[in-house]
Amino acid sequence: MKILLSNDDGVYAQGIHALADALRDLAEIVIVAPDRNRSGASNSLTLEHPLRVSQIAENTYSVQGTPTDCVHFALNELMKDALPDLVLSGINHGANLGDDVLYSGTVAAAMEGHFLGVQSIAFSLAGTTHFASAAHFVRQLVEQHLANPIPTNRLLNVNIPDRPLELIQGIEVTRLGARHHAESMIKQKDPRGHDIYWLGPPGKEQDAGPGTDFHAIERGWVSLTPLQVDLTAHESLRSMDHWLKEKVNG
């Protein structure tokens, strides 16, 4: 078995090495990850300059690019003659819950694997401390997949509470919650007196009730959310067709 690992925190991040260590005795591990932190890169690709790739250790590659670049390169070049059985992204340093998944490079790396036909899972720790807890559930889910393959071709988004293992309740299948709009920009001055701006903190949860990923994490459960790439609002197709015919086309 062969597993491709990537992330958005960078090739030297603690999370991706905790992920690798949890699985080395189960599969051949290949790491292809950004050369630096690329959090928030979403599904962006590098188009205006070439990708520079460095092998920094056995089966470990650093890419001057985004998480999506990394998986695209790995599956279309590095591993094209022997594709991996799984693409795993993470373990992210921080949760990817609700609509955060739209910005997440961690989820995007797994999504690229999904686009290219490989079962893919994104893993995130809701903090930066208990990577051993996250690694335990990574291993559990991969072993379950080996014994009984995941019954869907959907991309999976998994978030693990940042708690000691004995304080985690188990795994719960969830839907995405939602946040309020992010807080306003933070305006500052640079040393030369020019205005600079930082993104404000994320908005508070708006939809975090039972059944959501937010609710699971808050209660000490691992959240497992199947995601789909189709962004079509299928329930609106009929009303939009009616609107177009009646209001636009006469």
Swiss-Prot record:
Cofactor: a divalent metal cation
Reactions catalysed according to its record: a ribonucleoside 5'-phosphate + H2O = a ribonucleoside + phosphate
Assigned keywords, A-Z: Cytoplasm, Hydrolase, Metal-binding, Nucleotide-binding
Residue ranges crossing the lipid bilayer per the database entry: none
Enzyme class: hydrolase
Subcellular location, record wording: Cytoplasm
GO molecular function, one term: metal ion binding
GO CC annotations, alphabetized: cytoplasm
Record-listed E.C. numbers: 3.1.3.5
Cytoplasm among keywords: yes
Cofactor: how and how many bound: Binds 1 divalent metal cation per subunit.
Main location: cytoplasm
Protein name stated in the entry: 5'-nucleotidase SurE
